[in-house]
Swiss-Prot record:
The phosphoenolpyruvate-dependent sugar phosphotransferase system (sugar PTS), a major carbohydrate active transport system, catalyzes the phosphorylation of incoming sugar substrates concomitantly with their translocation across the cell membrane. This system is involved in sucrose transport. InterPro entries: Glu_permease_IIB, PTrfase_EIIB_Cys, PTS_EIIC, PTS_EIIC_1, PTS_IIB_1, PTS_IIBC_sucr, PTS_Sugar-Specific_Components. This is PTS system sucrose-specific EIIBC component. It is an enzyme of class 2 (transferase). It is found in: Cell membrane. GO terms for biological process: phosphoenolpyruvate-dependent sugar phosphotransferase system; trehalose transport. The PTS EIIB type-1 domain is phosphorylated by phospho-EIIA on a cysteinyl residue. Then, it transfers the phosphoryl group to the sugar substrate concomitantly with the sugar uptake processed by the PTS EIIC type-1 domain.
Length: 480
């Protein structure tokens, strides 16, 4: 492959050197900030053998090339343009300028929660393993594994502690990540999180039970002002708002406190004032809002049943195209942290249905495509990848390009999601939203069985609808 020629052709299709403001690359994609995306020649890019697909998200225009090749093409781009590679964070910052306020808000949530996902995934998957060990009826009739094989009980207890830690101490993770994102000191953010989950406080999990039972809530009395001594274990919204206040106060103090006293007074005053504000006003208010949000979404999912699942499943892929799905991470984290009352997250199973359907549609396109060997090759690899939870190549490289597979995919996603919602399948962990996602699913009410059946439904419907649409005259000769 002539990488120099490929780079020249890509640059020309992007609108020329003057249209590129910043550029970098990841493992598989060129990531660019363009002055005017309207100048991009999508057809020319699609005709290039080296390009597997393109899409625009988060203020960035991304060109899918593939592992092992993208770095070589990018190296030639650097030589041609004379521009050095920007860091990924610099490209993200530059791309943010092209976003509207809502897109910036979604990106903010993504920036905060994506770094802590590994901890949430680890805790959630360990929770799944613990459920396998402790749930009755999996290995023995009406009995759990640890009831029959008592030697596993110690292991189950240990895993249960490991699993609960990331959720119970979630404010510490959020505090660190959010403070960093808001321009404050990340360690002060973590310290604030530690304060909100201090063991001397009444646990956030015990607080609703105490209210329901009419028990007295412990409180501080500050000059006649009673402040509840209640923790914020597993809480998302209170910690987000509190950390924003902390970072704002910290940055303000650093502007007015003399340098010689900065390291002494700024942390002291920032933590003291934010802690007081949080326990007095912000915490109780945002805790209530958080309960309303998670309870409201859970009620909609359970009340809406199959119809609600159908609508969400139909809309999920279009939401992904806009990038708004990143905002779901915060909601999912709260739903899973409150799984004792919510039962877990309904978003993960529906995301899986969308991914499976995108993969099925891409595989259907593989069998339909006759002339375009390049697209046929992309469809086969992308289809398998989507079944395993990675949908970008399938969605942007095949299904949206041909249009009718995307229609088939959203129909399959809708039907599969309707089944999921009807049987109230939920996830107790974040993980890979695809075939490997079984371990993230709650085993209650035959959740694993219904999850598997729903994936089969989504696959068959998406594959079948895509194949049927290919015979329609308006789509018959489309091989972009």
């Amino acid at each position: 492959m002539n990488y120099k020629k490929s780079a020249e052709n890509i640059l020309q299709a992007l609108g020329g050197e003057d249209n590129v403001e910043a550029m970098t690359h990841c493992a598989t994609r060129l990531r660019l900030v363009l002055k005017d995306e309207g100048l991009v020649d999508e057809k020319a890019l699609g005709d290039m053998d080296v390009v597997k697909g393109t899409f625009s998200t988060g203020g960035q225009y991304q060109v899918i090339i593939g592992s092992g090749t993208v770095n070589k093409v990018f190296s030639e781009l650097e030589k041609i343009t004379g521009k050095e590679a920007s860091s990924v964070s610099e490209v993200k910052t530059q791309g943010t300028k092209n976003m509207n306020p809502f897109q910036r808000f979604v990106k903010m949530l993504s920036d905060i929660f994506v770094p802590i996902i590994p901890a949430i995934v680890a805790g959630g998957l360990l929770m799944g393993i613990n459920n396998i060990l402790t749930a009755p009826g999996i290995f023995y009739d009406n009995q759990s594994l640890i009831e029959v094989q008592n030697q596993f009980s110690g292991l189950a207890e240990m895993i249960n502690i490991f699993a609960n830690a990331p959720f119970t101490l979630l404010p510490i993770l959020i505090g660190f990540s959010a403070a960093k994102r808001f321009g404050g000191n990340a360690y002060l953010g973590a310290a604030l999180g530690m304060i909100l989950v201090h063991p001397e406080l009444m646990s956030a999990y015990d607080y609703p039970k105490a209210l329901e039972a009419g028990k007295e809530i412990p409180h501080w009395n500050l000059f006649g002002l009673e402040i509840n001594q209640v923790g914020y274990q597993g809480q998302v919204l209170p910690m987000l708002v509190a950390t924003y206040i902390l970072a704002t106060i910290e940055k303000g103090l650093r502007k007015v406190i003399p340098t010689v006293l900065d390291n002494l007074l700024t942390p002291l005053l920032a933590i003291l004032s934010t802690g007081f504000i949080t326990f007095s006003f912000v915490g109780p208010l945002t805790r209530t809002l958080g309960y309303w949000l998670s309870d409201g979404l859970t009620w909609l999912y359970e009340f809406g049943g199959a119809i609600g699942g159908l609508i969400f499943g139909l809309l999920y892929a279009p939401i992904v195209i806009t990038g708004m799905h990143h905002s779901f991470i915060a909601i999912e984290t709260q739903l899973i942290a409150d799984s004792s009352s919510t039962g877990g997250s309904f978003i993960f199973p529906i995301a899986t249905m969308s991914n499976i359907a995108q993969g099925a549609a891409a595989l259907a396109a593989f069998f339909i495509i006759k002339e375009n060997k390049k697209l046929k090759g992309v469809a086969s690899a992308a289809g398998v990848s989507a079944l395993l939870g990675i949908t970008e190549p399938a969605m942007f490289g095949v299904n949206l390009k041909l249009r009718y597979p995307f229609i088939g995919a959203i129909v399959g996603s809708g039907i599969g999601s309707a089944y999921i919602a009807f049987f109230k399948v939920k996830a107790i962990a974040l993980g890979t939203a695809g075939i490997p996602g079984f371990i993230s699913i709650s085993g209650q009410n035959n959740g694993w069985l219904h999850y598997g059946i729903a994936m089969i439904i989504a696959f068959i419907v998406a594959f079948g609808v895509t194949y049927a649409l290919s015979y329609r005259k308006k789509y018959r000769n489309i091989e972009a």
